[in-house]
A protein has these predicted regions:
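Divalent-metal coordination cores built from histidine and acidic residues
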Residues: 72-101
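Flexible loop/turn segments at secondary-structure boundaries
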Residues: 15, 67, 94-98
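Acidic/polar N-terminal loop/beta-strand segments that form early-domain functional surfaces
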Residues: 16, 29, 65, 89-90
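Activation segment
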Residues: 17, 37, 68-70, 88
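Histidine-rich, glycine-flanked metal-binding segment
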Residues: 1-58
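Di-metal (Zn2+ and/or Mg2+/Mn2+) metal-binding site signature of metallo-dependent hydrolases
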Residues: 55-78
Length: 101
């Protein structure tokens, strides 16, 4: 049985720690990163070739104006196109959207 569900192979990893980028494989198990490093070919049920690609964690956009946009674009599509996986809303001192306390 494979050790990982998925291996992202040979990507250029930028991990957000200010460490220089590095080439590595990423082993995913149960939806979580289990290992970063050089992994054996048969260690996963599936693999994705990330050669020539940058692999990074999801970005957090700390300044958005999505308070109202959530009503007509519930997926905040433009953010996900750029690797953003989390957003902060209402941080400008006001919000457009009605909310419950």
């Amino acid at each position: 049985m494979p050790e990982y569900d998925l291996i992202i192979r040979d990507g250029m990893v930028i991990d957000g720690t200010r460490m220089p980028r590095f080439r590595a494989d990423i082993g995913i198990k149960n939806g979580r990163i289990a290992k970063i490093g050089r992994l054996r070919a048969g260690d996963a049920a599936k693999s994705v070739d990330a050669s020539g690609q940058i692999v990074a964690p999801g970005f957090v956009d700390l300044h958005t104006h999505y308070d109202a946009q959530l009503f007509w674009d519930p997926y905040c599509s433009i953010s996900s196109w750029h690797g953003v996986t989390s957003i902060v809303i209402g941080n400008c001192g006001f919000g457009f959207a009605p909310v419950r306390p």
